[in-house]
Amino acid sequence: KSTSCMEAGSYCGSTTRICCGYCAYSASKNVCDYPSN
């Protein structure tokens, strides 16, 4: 199945699509980010 995910830098939250990486929470805003490896 094809999954639609949000790229890094996109706003993430309970009402948004799943991030391609993960949702990075901060005090000002929550944005999608990729794991650093």
From Swiss-Prot:
Any one annotated GO CC term: extracellular region
Keywords: Amidation, Calcium channel impairing toxin, Disulfide bond, Ion channel impairing toxin, Knottin, Neurotoxin, Presynaptic neurotoxin, Secreted, Toxin, Voltage-gated calcium channel impairing toxin
Free-text tissue specificity from the UniProt record: Expressed by the venom duct.
Keyword Disulfide bond: yes
The keyword Disulfide bond belongs to this UniProt entry's keyword annotation: yes
GO molecular function: calcium channel regulator activity; toxin activity
Places the protein is found: Secreted
Main location (coarse class): secreted
Propeptide positions: 1-4
Disulphides: C5-C20, C12-C23, C19-C32
Domain of life of the source: Eukaryota
Family note: Belongs to the conotoxin O1 superfamily.
UniProt function note: Omega-conotoxins act at presynaptic membranes, they bind and block voltage-gated calcium channels (Cav). This toxin blocks N-, P- and Q-type calcium channels.
Comment block on domains: The presence of a 'disulfide through disulfide knot' structurally defines this protein as a knottin. The cysteine framework is VI/VII (C-C-CC-C-C).
Protein name, as recorded: Omega-conotoxin-like S6.7
Organism the protein comes from: Conus striatus (Striated cone)
